[in-house]
Every structure is written in C-alpha cells, then in structure tokens.
C-alpha cells in the first residue's frame, strides 16, 4: 500500500484557488465572476489557510473544489464561450465593413437562459420568498436609474414593471405589516405565505452621476439580470394564488372609448397600472375578501396547547382589524408629498386615495370633493382649507400602521412639531437604550411621568402650592374668629346650659380623681404582665445595614477578573470579543442617553426663553395700555 504524500488528502484537496478554477473552466475572469453570481457560488474561508494552500503563506481567493466541479456541468459555460466567438467574428465583420454579415450575426446573438438556474437554486416557492429581500431592494433601486453606460434602459424599465406588479399584489392581498421612513428610504415589510419580506424603496431624488467609480455597476447588473427572472416567476405564482390575471389587466369597464384610450391603449393601461390606484382584473367573479372560519374555543381548550392556539387566534383577529385600518377614509395627497409610498400604504389597509391630476395620471377625485376625510400636506400653511377634513403630515399614516390603530391627528397638524418616528423593526425587550417615547407605547402610565419632568409642570405645581397656602391662611383666620366668638358667648352665658362654671369645675374634679385611681390600678396590672412576658421572650433592636457601593463594584470587578482567568486558552479570543461587544453596547447606550439629556435641556431652555419673551411682551403691552389710559 502506497503511503499518501503531503497535501494529497484532507483540507488541501477540499479547496481550489481562483486561478486554478479559471484554468479548469477555461473562462476569463469576468465570465467566471458572472457564472459564480448566477449560480450562487462564493469564495470560502478555510480553517487552516496554510494547509488549504498546500504550504503557501500568501493569501489567495479559495473556492470549494465541489463547487467548481459543479460549474463544469453548467450549460451557461458554453454560452459564455459562444460570446467570445461572437465578439471575434462580429469584430472581424466590422473591421472589413461587411455590414450584411454583421447584421445577420447580431440577429443570432447568443442569449443566456436562466430559468433552470432559478428552479435549481429555489426548489420550493417558500425558498424563493425567503430570498426575496435583497431581490426587491436591488430592483427598486435600479428602477430609479436612467440609462447609464453599464445599465441599459430596457433593464431599468423591466425592473420598474416587475416592482409595480409586486406592489399590486401587496395591495390586493393586504399583506403589508410594517412601514418606516429613514435616510436610506422607505422600509416596507409584508407577510407572504407566512414569510416576512422586507425591502427598501429609495427616496425620489434626481439621479446624480458619480465622478469616481466607487460602485461596480457591472457586477450589480449581473445580480439584477438574475433577480428579474426570479421576481417574474414569483409574481406569476403570487398572482395566480389570488386569481388575478397575469400580466396585470384592467376590467373592460375601465377601458371606455375616449381620447386617451383611442390614442394609445397600451400606454394608457401602463400609466394606470403604475398609478396603483385601480383594481386589477380577476379570473374569477368573486372579489369579496375571504372570511376566516370561526373556531370553537371550547374545543380548543380541551387541547394541551390551548393557550398557544388562543394566542394565535387573537393575533389573527388583530391582523384582520389591521387590514381594514383605513377602511371608510378618503385621502387626498398634495403635490409636495411623495405619492407612491403613501398610495401603497393607504390602499393596502382599505383606504381610498387620490391626488392632483396634473401630478400623475390615475387620480379618481379632485381636492374639492367634500367627502375627503384627510388631506396629506407637507407645508407649513395652506391658502384654502376645508372644515370637513383633517390636514395632516405624512408621518401620521406611517405611525398609525406601526401602532395598528388610528392615532389622534392633533399632533400631526400643519406646522406642528412631529413626535419621534419610532422604528417597528427593533425588539422591544432588547437590553440596549430605549427612548422614553417607545417605553410610553408599551406602558402608557409612563407618559404622565415623562410629561411632569418639564418646567411647565414645575411652575404649575409652584403656583398651585402658593394658592394652597393662601387658602390655608384664610381658613385659619376664619377658624380663629369663630373660636373667639364661641368662647365669648360661653363666658357671657355661663356655659351652654346656664350652669355655673365653679360648680361644674368641682364636680369634674371629683369625678376625675376617681377615674385616675382606677386607671392607675389598671396600669399597674399591665406593667406586671409585660414584665412577665419580657422575661419569657426578649427582642433586640435591629441595625440598618448600609451598602457600600464602592465595595460592591470592586467585588463585581474581582469576580469578573476571576472569570476571565478561568477561561480556557482556546476560548480567550471569543471571550475578549464578547467583552468588546458588551463594552461597545454600553458606550453606545451611554452616548444616546447623554444625547437625549442634551436635547431635553435644549428644549427646556427654548421653552423658558419663549415664556420670558411672552412675559416681556405682555408687560410692555400692559405698560403701553396704562400710558394710553393716563393720557
């Protein structure tokens, strides 16, 4: 039996360098990158790099040998090689100016088919939904791009079409659960087939080209190429699950013969689909929402897991109420407000929405409609206002969805300072810093305590205390006067029943002596009993134990150092990493608390300054009025 040589087995054979993989696949570096992105193959980090690199100490990009062997059988490899042949032949035709042959070759351009790769990477539909977050975020980003050097216009238009189709499904299924506004964009989270899908829609700013090539658009466009095929499959499956026609279509009642439809019906339909404000055509006649079947709670209580099932039932009822949160409300979006995110949210929760027809096509009613209940405005004031509606800022819609109830609109009126916009994607039971507003959401009793920390409440308490002292002084004076009147009447008429005071005093003294003798006898008996009981049982007075915080902290530090010494040498790096993470969290929490204290102090100072200025203005006005009265 031959003895195996070094690096012929084990970890050295499990990994292969990128250069060796390129030689094995006979591909260029760009084609290899494209193939790895499409197939989902990525570099690996070995446990022992020196062994994996067969004794070499330089850092190389390594892949699993099985992954490279897996790429050898991929049909796309032949298509990528055909690209190389096509480039050579078309370049030759272009050089000799054989345009007839060049036109024929361009018609036979080799295309990559990715359908089998999507089915291979996602065997089930749930697997595709789990990987939908990055897909949607990237496609929403590319849908906002203009035509660039490495991003053709057809790709951006395809991203726009697929994302609009997905948003129509979210609206029709009412599967939206959480929303949030941040610097990056608008966060949305939907629950589809029991899976939570989260994506980001960027803010609508004009595109600004970058002078430096910090982002590799070529690599990103390869991801987009795969994700467009994946989202197309997903949309097809989702639409058929709701009995919606795919591609999305409108009922024939909408396509009436008018000037817009007669000019170009396809552009009319595409604009209305992009408006997200119309119901889509269904393959079945029934358009009513499916009601949840009633569950017999008595039957559930017989089961061992009845509490868990009842909790699930309560959550389902809460989600059913959330899906109709804006039902019966009519919204109108002003020109300065971003239209698309608000239309998605309002229509996903059963509301009706419209906007100015000059902003975008698809508006259903005008601003002058008297049945509008809420108008969303993002400016300090309006020239004309209607009494029958509430003028609110856009944050009200997002906060209502996150708190799953219709909030009062007085904090969101025009020109009002908005309350903090809290993220619904954080854990309420986390150990890090929690803002006081978020604590007040979970415990409403904290709202009052937080409000009492302002200077206004302090001044109100001081004023109330002054009023109480004045009232007490008046009450004491009245009581003193009544007492003096009563004593004067008593002396004048010789007691309440006309009895002489001296006789009454002698009788009282005689009775008092008898009572005092009896009381002394009782006290003697009690003292005897107490002395007998003390002999049987004695209790010593306790002492208050004062906790020394410095000694307590020192004991904790010593215990922590002892734990650090007891850690095994192979686990010390992990222990240090955990300690660093803990220290960074504590530092971040301390910084946030300090920042919040500074903000609260600034707001208090601003309130004090406003009050002082108001008092000065009132005093000046009173002085001016008095001068006018004297004149």
Curated annotation (Swiss-Prot):
Primary residence: nucleus
Coiled-coil intervals: 510-541
GO molecular function, one term: ribonucleoprotein complex binding
Biased composition (Acidic residues): 454-469, 499-524
Residue segments, region Disordered: 450-469, 489-569
Basic and acidic residues biased stretches: 525-536, 553-562
Biased composition (Basic residues): 543-552
InterPro entries found in the cross-reference section: BRCT_dom (IPR001357), BRCT_dom_sf (IPR036420), PES (IPR010613)
GO cellular component: nucleolus; nucleoplasm; PeBoW complex; preribosome, large subunit precursor
Alphabetized UniProt keyword annotations: Coiled coil, Nucleus, Phosphoprotein, Ribosome biogenesis, rRNA processing
Residues bearing the modification Phosphoserine: 453, 457
Cellular compartment(s): Nucleus, Nucleolus; Nucleus, Nucleoplasm
GO biological process, one term: maturation of 5.8S rRNA from tricistronic rRNA transcript (SSU-rRNA, 5.8S rRNA, LSU-rRNA)
BRCT domain segment(s): 321-414
Described purpose of this protein according to its UniProt entry: Required for maturation of ribosomal RNAs and formation of the large ribosomal subunit.
Similarity remark: Belongs to the pescadillo family.
Protein name, UniProt field: Pescadillo homolog
Native organism: Drosophila mojavensis (Fruit fly)
